[in-house]
Structure formats: structure tokens, C-alpha cells
Amino acid sequence: MASSEADSRLSRVVTPALEKIVKNASWRKHSKLANECKAVIERLNSLQKSPPPSSSAATDSESESSVPGPLNDGGSIEYSLADSELIFSPLINACGTGLAKIIEPAIDCIQKLIAHGYIRGESDPSGGAESLLLFKLIDSVCKCHDLGDESIELPVLKTLLSAINSISLRIHGKCLLLVVRTCYDIYLGSKNVVNQTTAKASLIQILVIVFRRMEADSSTVPIQPIVVAELMEPLEKSDADGTMTQFVQGFITKIMQDIDGVLNPTMSGSGSGSGSGGQDGAYGTTTVETTNPTDLLDSTDKDMLDAKYWEISMYKSALEGRKGELTDGDAERDDDLEVQIENKLRRDACLVFRALCKLSMKAPPKESSADPQSMRGKILALELLKILLENAGAVFRTSEKFSADIKQFLCLSLLKNSASTLMIIFQLSCSIFISLVARFRAGLKAEIGVFFPMIVLRVVENVAQPNFQQKMIVLRFLDKLCLDSQILVDIFLNYDCDVNSSNIFERMVNGLLKTAQGVPPGTATTLMPPQEAAMKLEAMKCLVAILKSMGDWLNKQLRLPVSNSLNKSDVIEIDLGPGSPQLANGNADESADGSDTYSESSGGTSDALAIEQRRAYKLELQEGISLFNRKPTKGIEFLINAGKVGESPEEIAGFLKDASGLNKTLIGDYLGEREDLALKVMHAYVDSFDFRGMEFDEAIRTFLEGFRLPGEAQKIDRIMEKFAERYCKCNPKVFTSADSAYVLAYSVIMLNTDAHNPMVKNKMSADDFIRNNRGIDDGKDLPADYMRSLYERITKHEIKMKEDDLRLQQKQYANSNRMLGLDGILNIVIRKQWGDSYAETSDDLMKHMQEQFKEKARKSESTYYAATDVVILRFMIEACWAPMLAAFSVPLDQSDDLIVINICLEGFHHAIHATSLMSMKTHRDAFVTSLAKFTSLHSPADIKQRNIEAIKAILRLADEEGNYLQDAWEHILTCVSRFEQLHLLGEGAPPDATFFASKQNESEKSKQPKQYILPVLKRKGPGKSQYAATGVLRGSYDSMSLGGKGSKNVRQEQMSSIVSNLNLLEQVGEMNQVFSQSQKLNSEAIIDFVKALCKVSMDELRSPSNPRVFSLTKIVEIAHYNMNRIRLVWSSIWQVLSGFFVTIGCSENLSIAIFAMDSLRQLSMKFLEREELANYNFQNEFMTPFVIVMRRSNDVEIRELIIRCVSQMVLSRVNNVKSGWKSMFMVFTTAAYDDHKNIVFLSFEIIEKIIREYFPYITETETTTFTDCVNCLVAFTNNRFSKDISLSSIAFLRYCATKLAEGDLNSPSTNKYKGTSGKIPQSSLHSGKSGKQENGEIVNNNHLYFWFPLLSGLSELSFDPRPEIRKSALQIMFDTLRNHGHLFSLPLWEKVFESVLFPIFDYVRHSIDPSGEDESADQGSSGGEVDELDHDAWLYETCTLALQLVVDLFVKFYTTVNPLLEKVLMLLVSFIKRPHQSLAGIGIAAFVRLMSDADGLFSEEKWLEVVSALKEAAKTTCPDFSYFLSEEYVARSQRSALNIQNSNAESAAPTATDGNEESQRTATHLYAAISDAKCRAAVQLLLIQAVMEIYNMYRPQLSAKNTLVLVDALHGVALHAHGINSNTILRSRLQELGPMTQMQDPPLLRLENESYQICLTFLQNLVADKTKKEEEEEEEEIESLLVNICQEVLNFYIETSSSAKKLQSESSRASEYRWRIPLGSGKRRELSARAPLIVATLQAMCTLDEASFEKNLKCLFPLLANLISCEHGSNEVQTALADMLGLSVGPVLLQWC
């Protein structure tokens, strides 16, 4: 039940309007209308008294006749359809009266009903009664426009806009189009400017509403009013006060707010609670359910969704009212209705879009071709389309439906309008096309590929005779297009990298270049000079915009992570300027969210490898096509070899048929060739056509549209013959034979030429054509009707190639790189427009255009790629860098216009930015060097304002692009250096050469002429007059050095120009920012910067006559600026600076070197202020240049300066010095070896102070520092100037040892030994090859880091040739070891033995080298004797002492070092092995000393090591007499005897000299062999004696096992000696040498006897020592060994005694010249010498017990019997034998008996 207040709402709106209609109506004409109005008023009054029931209450009770109507009172009461018709009827009729005073209140009433929401429902003429009623209502309002009354136009617009904006009244379909068309007609037909503007604004607002709702899929989306001021055209802005704009804005705003005013109060009264919840509870009682999932969303989203559900409920109510029933499944119906809404909203948008496209294509009738109203309509439609596209949302951009509409309708509109001569239409067409490129390119790849050349490139490439306005429009739009950085990259990727597409980007750049360069000289042009200048400027702006766009895209990509999928970065959002405003409709949200921009059209993102492959493929294919268009055969061959075309004729034919860019004439020439391949290709080409079902002329048209028939008759004959064969094969029933088709084909071609050649005056008639072809069908005529129809078709439609349509385009823009000719389509338009049949053939043109689109889509790669990989930019730069460089360089060099200059400089900046980011060194350097040359700093006489601007650009480049310049920094810094040079020149400051030039150069400079001092400079003061001329004429940029050389003679006018130009430099500002800003560079850039600065500085300093230190001082500055960088980066920086300072520090120019070292000192002092943690090496790296310069510099002053600098740094920053100690000690180490005495004394003085006062600092952090300290002291010990310094250095080494022992040092427990450095002996570096001591305990031994370097240094000094130094070093070293060895652990002792002690004896241990012996034998005797004397002195003095001390150390610390016994024994054995009797004796004595001192220390295992060492020594020291038995000895002896004879015969013969030399060499070898044998024999005697001595000392401690090892060793010695003694040949040869050998005969008899004697003693003792209780097997072994040795001895004696006759016979054959010894006496002496051994042997056998003796008697008795028969040299043997027979053998024999 409604209240009276609610009931009166409708009547308050309707009643006054009806009363006014009644008042204004004429009773005679409009009596019916008046009566209807009164009836409605009465009905409303009656309804007010008895209101109709609400729809909710009457649903079940009402009959079908009382259907609810579209009218309601704004509350819950709804009027029936009949009541609604009753109320609407007078309003509709009033609108049809044609009287403004009647229409106006009716329209006003309708508008209020709509605005207040009293009308709800959908207006649709094809719908039900309710929809039809609403359509009639809206239609009546639209028809009011036909009245032509200006007063009615605004109410109509107001009503229609209210209807569209209404939420309750839904305008769709035809009704919507009717509304749009009405507003459109009002704009065109109204004569009131305000009404026109209002109509246009209303149209735009309607479009905003329709498309905004479509984007949101809801009719309830809030819509903001448009901003009218942004839509005003220049003509419409004639009202300066803006009243019209304000009026229209108020008109639109009020209508939009009226709807909100109706909705908001109702909504705010709902249960939602919040005023901001707009539509939240408007009609929620009938729609929103309690389980609504939108509770999870925020309030705004809920408001939107609730309003949408309310809208759905209205549809539901309408359907319920129409059908009178409810269905189950309400949720499903909701979904269906939502889809229906979406479909309707999209359908509305599509309808409006299509309608606008059609309106934009509407051509004026012929008779009114210049109709301004028609043009205004076209312009308005294009403007509306432009606005729609520029504000397109996500749905519009991605919907397939809209994409299809764009292709089908908008593209045709563009095709028609882009050729318009009216600039506004062309401008709008361009704007629409740019919007398509910016927002829709993903789905319009083929279309853009056609339109871009047609609209843009056609205009850009026309340089000589363009339409100025048209070209300026295109250039400005290109400039705006570049605002979106993604567009150009996508264009390049999808077209320039597409084989079947034109090189759009490349052609665009080249066209802009040609435009920027202007019309070529001598070419006719229609441009005026100001126009040409403006066009050049705009073209350069476009080029700059392109480069900027590329750089912006690159910046964006590098900041984003690499992704293989599309993301929001792919959004296309571009502002095309003030002419295309962003409307305040909320669509910016959709534009900003580009996640679906390419969701449907794009197939993926770009891949670097695929891009590279496609680009390379296209370039190579273009090269092949270009070659084909010059030489077809070679072109085909190239393409086949490149793999672009297959080798088969079929593949070649397919290429000729389908490829774009091929010259049609040359295709025909190639097909007509008679070569085998070309002929096969022609056959394959013709066979590829399918002529089935085609008329003959149609087949010829199809065949000939791909190429031009060649001019040669034979070629034509071959081609047409094959065509006739193919046609007859496809159509066998048309002609009797192929001959008929062949002849007819020729006739058709001739007819075509005759009919369409304007030069032919007398045209061929049909009868003539028929007559000419009689009897061609196998003697018969072809049917006349067939021939006549053929004639008609040929004469009406010319047979032509596709190329004919493009001929004009190709003439204008011949370009071999252009792959696609589709841009020539525009020429079709132009030609048709110029002709009279434009309108008649437009349909054909559109059809042809569609075919081209399809062909383009078929040929091109269908996938649209969104560029994401930055590698694409590399190819873009390669394609455009050269044109860009030319476009900017020429104007910059020639123009003085600052605008042009700044544009060019900006282009340079962006080009350098892009090339630097892409690391394209060559391209970047091309731009940078060009820009640097334009500064003209190398030629200051030519400096102008443009050069100053270039200098500023250089500075800006350094500031903004510094992170990417890499080695291009060199050019930047070169300019900075030259600028500063000129700046100082302008101030009159003296050049650096005044202070730093070398003396020689100064003297030469004084001789130079003085004509540089000119009157014009004298006003500037004496400084400037003196130095200004040095910077005048420098030559070219490349040839000029930064140091500069003397210039040529300077004229006065040049100098005047220089002075004025130098004043220009004041504009540039402070250059120091380049260096102060270096701290902002990234880690890689600062390194490049430093490298470049060092290189520039080197160039400055290289000049001997005019050196400069500007960059050198800046190096110090930037080092200060960047010293706070992380150490990793600073280390890389210093690596560059270090090499630089080393080079400068070693400069021949002493002043510069001193300056460099002082600069380095400043940096080092600054750096040492920073603390350094342990184990870092930065300080050492920083100070390394001092070390290198100290070593390399030849200047005493520099070396002294370095010493003082280093001492100052270290002593003043001693608390912070850590790793810097290393470099410091290396400097002083180098100084210790200096050739100048003062440097040595100065450096030692400083070292003395450091060690005395700061010694704890040396060892507190770095482990190797102490090593360097020791090396330094060792170096001073080796100095050659002062023995006092040497001894003091050794004393400091002792001091260091004392400090170590006292434990005053901070032990770096966390450090690890890093090995020796400096001059530690190489042996110490190789001593630990096994690697054992590097692991385990050593790492944790703190003493190792300090003791080892100290001891290694002392060890090195033991080699010093000066005895004082050598003795002191050994004394200190061993005193240190003795006194502090108890502090050492085993690992440290191992290191000490291996790397300190053993290296002292390295020469001894490693000198057993046969090659060394041979070399020494070959040398002269005199020199060798002197060396050996010195050598022996060192051996006796040093080795004896050192070896004894080593043994004593080992014994003293045996408890710790016992694992080293084996190594010590090997050292002693190495001495014994030495083929030097004295050294071997030293080794044996040390061995015995070791054994004697080690009383009771050795275990069984250690004793085994000892006896094994003795065995090894015995084995390796056996005397070698093999030389005397060799063939070499025999041969040399014979040659020596021959030489002696010859020398006796011919005293002066030349051969005597040769013989003497041979004799000398023989004697040398002989002497060496004898000496070696004697030495080894003596050593072995000493060795067996030492063994006996050791045995006697430790017999109780030696086990049988160890004793047997000794027996084995001595037995080997005895056997070897006996072998020598029993060799009669050897003995005879030794005897032949006479007293030379000084050896008895036999030579080793004593050694043999003593060896056997000791063996018998050892074995007897083993047998006798029963206390040891050896095992039975071991005892048997000992007895067996004893018996065997006894047998050996007896056998040897018996053999010796019985060999007299053999020796006598050999002696008789001896040479009479040889020395003879009576054998008898010698034999007796030998036997006498062997007698004691025989006696001992017999006695040893007697010591066997009875059982053993009896067991072995069988083998011994024969020897005893033979012994009786021997001749003895002594009676001792006989006595001992008698005793044995009597005491031992006799009892056994008697027992056997």
C-alpha cells in the first residue's frame, strides 16, 4: 500500500506537462490530443485515490489482462501496461504534432520520467508490448528533431542522453542506434553552434556509457561526465569567454547527476548503512540473498555486484510479467540473464562501432561531392572512432568480435579516408591508425603490415614533392607513437624480422633520414624553404624519439626479471597529445591493466635465438632477391646455395610464384630461358596452376598476373606452348588439341594489347577477332558465340599483372630491401580517385583490398610476438645506427640553429645510451667519437656556440650514462682534459710543461721563435701572452695528442678568435663534477672510468716537450672519492691504478716520476687511515707500486724518495699497518741490494728503527710479514758496502729469535702458513713435496709461522762466501735450535730439518751425478784444482761443523724428533756415498758420533733403520774398476802408445800435437777412474771399520736379525773385493799403469780380508752368545752361513795358491815396454796377507760344536786336504791347520773308525 505522498510523485511530473500541452494545443487541430491529456489527468487523480496494488502483492491475484507496465511511481507501486499506455499516449502524440510549444512540455515530461526512474524496462521494437511501447516513446522523441526547431534540439538531446544514462530504462539494439543517429543528425543539421557542440558532447557521453558498461559487463557501473573543454575543436573555441563550453559542460553534468540524484537517496535509505555504498541497497529486497559470497569483498565491489544483481532482477521481473510464471532453478536463471546482459551490452557496443565505421565511410553523392555537411558527418564519425580507440578498455582490445569488426569495417574506413585530400580527414585517419598500432597491433598484424606503408611510409619516403601538411601530420604522429617504447620494438620484431613482411622500421628510419637531410641538390621540389626547414626539424625530432623509445624500452626490460610469459609490462599505453584526451570515464583502469592485452592474439614472446635466426634468414633472402632482380640466374644459384630455395624445379617455381619483391619482368625472362634448369622450372611453374573449369581468358589472366611476358618471341613461344598444353590437360574437352589453345592464346594477347593500348587508333572488332581465328581448332572454327563472349570480356577487362597496380609505387620508392609491395595499394586508391570511375569501382577496390589482407595474413607469420628479449634491440641498432649518425652529424656540423643543435645532441645522447647498454662497442664509439669531434676542443680556433653545446652534451653524457660507457670513457675524459687545458689557457695560467718538461726539451724550447707573443694578447697579461699560443692549432681530432706539440705560426686574427672563443668556455661550468660524481658509478663502471682516466693521463704525460698532469691529479681525486667502496671493488680499481703508477714512477721525466710517487704517497696515507682486518691483503696491494718502482727505476732520487715515503707512511700509521708490512720490507729488501751506498745506509737505518721500536707490530697479524722481515735482514747481510751492516743484520736475527723464545709476540693462532716469500731458499719451497707436514698438527702450531722464516734465513746465510758471516749464521742458527728446541713440536722439527738444516747439505746430497763427474773430468786441471781447494775448504769448515751440530741436535731432542731418524741417516749416507774421501769420512765420523751419543736410545726398529742405512752405504760405495775392462780403455791405450811412438819419431810433426791432446784426454779419464776407485776403496775400509766400532759399542743391544743385516752388508763388500782381486786381466792392466795407481796387487786385498774377518767375528759371536737363545731355525741359519763363508775363504785361498803357473804364462806375453814385477815374490806376499784370514777361518770352524763340525766335515775335509798341498807364504797357516787336524778332525775320524 502506497502513501499519498508516494502516489503524488508521478502526477507531480505528468499532470503539469499535460496541462501545459492542453493549454498550448489548438482545440480544432489537436482536440483529440487535448482530450487524451484530460483523460490521463483524470486517471491519475483516480489512481491517487485508489492506488493499484503492488506487484509483489498482486502477482498471484492479477489476471493476465493486467500485466505490469513500464511505468511506476518511483516506489513499490507499478502501473499496469494499460495505464502506462494511457499515460504515454498523449506524450507520444504531442511529440508528433510538429509544434514546438506542444512538443517541448511533452519531451520535458518524458525526460523527467526517465531521470527520476519512473520508467523502467527495455526499449526494443521487436520485443513485447512493454518494449514496443518504450520504443515508440523514444522514437517519438527522436522524430522531434525532424521539426528543425533549434529550441527543441536541446530537450531532445537531454531526453536521449537521460534515456541512455538511465539504469531503469534500458536502451539496446535498434533503439540505441536510433538515439545515436538522432544525436548525429542534430550535430549535422543544427545551425546553432551551441546545439552542435552539445550534440557532439552528448554523442561522446553516450559512447562512453555504452562502452564503459560493455567493459564492466554491467549497466550499473558508475559513469563520470566527460570533460567538454578537452573535446573542443579550434573553431569551437572561438568563444574566448568560454561560456559555450561551460554551458555544454553543465548540460552534460546535470543529466549525469540527475540519475545519481534519483538513485542515491533511495540507496542511502537502505540497510547498507554507508553513503559511499552507492547502489548497495537500492532494490536489494527483491534480489540479494543472505548467502551472497560477495561478503568476502570490500564494500565498493559489493556495491557494484549488488547493483548488478538488481539489474538482473529487473530482467527477471520483466520475463515473469511477460510469461506469467516462475521457473525452478533461480541460480541458473541468474547466470543466464547475466550472460544475456553481457551479450546485449557487447552487441550494443558492436552496433554503435559498426555504425560509426559506416558513417565514416559514407561518400557524398556525385552532385554534392563538396557538401560540407557530409564532410562534417564523416569528420564527426572519425573523431568518435578516434576517441573510442584511444580509450579502449581490455574487453574492446582483446575481444575477437571487436577485432573482427575492426578488420571488416574500420580497416575499410581507413582505406577510403587515408587517401583523402582533406587534411582533417587524413589527420583523423592517421590518428585512428596510430591508435590501432598502439593498442590493437597484437590482433591486427596483417592489417598493420599493409596500412603502415600505405599511410605512413608512403608519405615519409616522399622527399622531393610531398604534401607539406600531410607529411607534417605523419611526422607528428610518428613522434607521438614513439612515446610507447614497446611499439617500435614490436614493429621491428614482427615485420622487419618477418620474411614475408616489409621492413617497416628500417624504411621508416631511412625515410626520416632523407627527410632530415632535405631535398637532394638539383631535384625539383614543391616545398618552400621554411617548409623544408620545418620538415627537417620534425624528422629529426622523430629520429630522436625513436632512439629515446628504444632506450626507454631497454631500461624497462633490464629492470624486469626475464619471463617467458606475458606480463603487465606488455601494456600498450600511449598519450597521443592534447588532441586525444583521456576521458574521465574510468577507462584508465582497463588501460593500465594489460594482462589481457595479447591474451588472445599473441602467440608468445620473443626468443633471442629465434629472433637472430629470423633476422639473418630475412637479410640473406633479401640479398638473394636483390641479386635475382639484377641477374636472375645468379640470384637463383645464390638462394639455392644459401638454403633459401630447394634445388628441385618445383621448389624454384614455387618460390618464383609466391615470393614477394621479385621483378616480374625478370621472372618472365628467367622462365623463357632455354637452359635446362630454367626450362624445367618453367614447366614446373606452369604445371602448378589448376585451370580446371576456367574460361580461357580467365586462365590466361591467372597465369600472367605473376610475371610479365618477355620481349623475345622464342621465350614467349616456349611459355605459351606450355600454357596451352597445361590448359588442355586440365580442360580436355574445350579444344581438339593443344595447338588450338596455343594459337588462341596468342590471339588473346594480341587482342588485349590492341584493345587497351592508347596508341592503337583502329581497334579490332569482334568480327575481326573471329575472322583472325578461323580454322584454328584442327581445321574447324571455334563457336562464334564463344569467341564473341571471349572478345567482350577481354575488351572490357584488361589482362594485367598484379605489378601493374603497383607500378607508380615502385617508381617512387624502388628499394631492393623491400620485400612486400602491399603498400602500393594506396596507389590504387589514388589512381581511382583521380579517375572518373572512383565511386563506380569502390566496391571492386574494397574486394581487392580484402584479398590483399587475406594474402598478407596467409603469407605472414600468424603469431604476433611481444618483444621481451633485449637482443632484439641489437638488430634494431644495426639497422638504424648509420642513418641516425648521418642525420645528426650533418646538421650539427653545418647548422647554427640552437634548436636543431639541441635536437641533434639529444639524438646523440639517446643513441649512445642504447648502444652502451647493449655493449655495442663499434656503434657506441661511432657516436661518442663524433660527438667528441663536434666539441672542436682539438681546434679551439674554430669553437662556436654549437661546440659549446656539444661540450655540455658530453658532460651530460658522463653524468647520466656513466655506468654504461665502458671504454668510451676515454673520449669523454679526453674532452674534459682538453677543455681544462683551454680553460687554463684562457685564464693565462702557465702550462704544466713549465714545471714538468725535461731539461733537454726546455733547452730546445728556448730556441723556438717567439712570434707567438702578439699585441692582441698583451692586454690579457704576461701569463696569457706567454702561453696562449700553445693551444691554438692542434690539427685533427685523431692526430692530436693531449700533451700537444709546438703549433704552427699563428696569425693575429686567429689569435683574436682564440681569445674570444675561450670566453665561450665559461658557459660550460665546472668540469670537476665528472670526477666528483664518479663515486655514484656502479662497480663495473668505476673500473672502466679509472682505466680510461689512466690512459688519458698517459697520453698527457707522453709528450716530452709539453707534459700535463691534469688527469694525474684527477686520478688522486677519484681515488679519494671512491676509497669507501667495498674492498672487492677497490681492489679492482687499485689493480688498474697500480700499473699506472708503476709506469709513471719509472718515467724518464724525473719531475713527473717524483710527482707520481708523491701522489701515490698521499693516497697511501689516506688508505692507511682505514683499518684492515687480519688475513686481508689490501694494504699490500696498495703499496705494491712502491716495490715495483723501487726495483725498476734507474733514478737514485726516485728510489730515495720511495724509501722516505714508505718510512713516513709506516711510521706515522704504524697502528693501522697490517699487510702493508710486506710491501714495506720488500722495498727495503730491494734497497739492500742497491748500487748506491747512501740508499743502503738510509734503508738500514730505518729498518733498525722499525725492528727496535715496532717489532711487535710486525707479527701481530700477517704470518708472512715476519718472513719478509727475515728476508730483509738477510738481504742487508748480503750487502756489499758494509760488513758492519751485515753483522748487525745477523744480530737482529738473533734478536728476533730471542723475542720469539720470550713469547712476547702475538701468536696468530687463526692464521695458516702461506709458504715463504721473498728470498727464502728454493729448497725450502720444495722440501715438503710429500705434503705430510702441510696437514694435521702443523696448521695449529703457532711457532711455525715465526720460527721457520727465521731459521730459513739463517740457513741461507750458511752459504755466504764470507767466513765471518757464515760462521755467525751457523752459530746463531744452531744456538737457537739448541737453546729453544724444547719449544718445538714434531711438525715444526720436521719442517726445520727438511727446509732449514738439510738444505745446508743439498750440494752434497744431490751431487752424485755421473754427468757431473764427466763434466768435471773434461775441465782443465788447473782451474779444477783451484776450485776443489776452495770447495774442500768449505767442506771441512762448514760441513763438518754443521753435520756434527745436526747430529748433536738430533740426539739432544731425540725424544721429540725420533721419527726423523730415517731422514738423518739418509743425510749421513748421502755423505758417505759422495765420491770424495774427505766428505765420506765426515759422514762416517758423524755416523759413528751419532751412534756413540745415542747410547741406549734406539729401539729394535730404530736399530733396523741404522743397520739398513749401513747396508745401503756399503752397497753403493763399492769400488768400480769397470773402466779398465772396457773397450774404450783398450782403444785409448793403443792410441796413446801409437802417439808416443809418433812423438818420438817426429818431434815437430803436426800429428804430435793431436796425439798429445788425445793422450791428455786419455790421462784425464784414467785419472778420474783411478781416483774414484781408490776413493771408494778407502771409504769402504773406513765404513767396515766404523761398523766394527759400532758393533763393539752396542754388541749386547744388537739382535741376531740386525747383526745378520750387517753380515750381509760386509759379505757383499768382501765378495765384490774378491771379484776385483781375482780378475787377473784387471790386475795386469793396473800393474801396467805402474806407480800411477799407487795401488798394491791385488788392489782390494785388505778390504777383502777385513770384510771376511769381521763377518767371521760377527758369526762366531752369534754362535758363541748362547744367552740370546735364538730360535733353532735362526741358529741353524747362522751356522750354515758361517760354514759357507769358511768354505768361500778356503776356496779363494786354494785358488790363489794354485794359480801361479797361469799368472806366469800371462806375464810372459806382456809387452816388453810394460813394467814387470817378479810374480813369485808377489805371490808370496799375497798369500802371506791372506794367511791371517785363513788362520781365523780354521779357528772359526773349530769353534763349532762337535755335532755341527761332524755334520759339515764332509764338505770341509776336501778343502783341508787341498790346503795341505798349497804353497804357503807363512807358517801360520800350517800351524793352524795342524792344530785343527789334531784337535778337531782327528777325534772325528777316530770316532768314525
From Swiss-Prot:
Biased composition (Low complexity): 55-66
Inhibition and activation profile: Inhibited by brefeldin A.
Domain of life: Eukaryota
Active site positions: 712
Localization per record: Cytoplasm, Cytosol; Membrane
Keywords from the named record: Acetylation, Cytoplasm, Guanine-nucleotide releasing factor, Membrane, Phosphoprotein, Protein transport, Transport
Biased composition (Polar residues): 284-294, 594-605, 1311-1327
Domain annotation SEC7: ranges: 610-797
Phosphoserine modifications at: 595
GO terms, molecular function: guanyl-nucleotide exchange factor activity
Matching InterPro entries: ARM-type_fold, DCB_dom, Mon2/Sec7/BIG1-like_HDS, Mon2/Sec7/BIG1-like_HUS, Mon2_C, Sec7/BIG1-like_C, Sec7_C_sf, Sec7_dom
GO cellular component: cytosol; membrane
Example GO biological process: regulation of ARF protein signal transduction
Cited SUPFAM superfamilies: ARM repeat (SSF48371), Sec7 domain (SSF48425)
Modification type N-acetylalanine: residues: 2
Region (Disordered) location: 45-71, 266-299, 579-606, 1311-1333
Keyword Nucleotide-binding: no
Residue stretches in coiled coil: none
Binding partners and assembly: Homodimer.
Task performed by this protein: Activates the ARF proteins by exchanging bound GDP for free GTP. Plays a role in vesicular protein sorting.
PANTHER family listed in its UniProt record: BREFELDIN A-INHIBITED GUANINE NUCLEOTIDE-EXCHANGE PROTEIN 2, GUANYL-NUCLEOTIDE EXCHANGE FACTOR
Protein name: Brefeldin A-inhibited guanine nucleotide-exchange protein 2
Recorded name of the encoding gene: BIG2
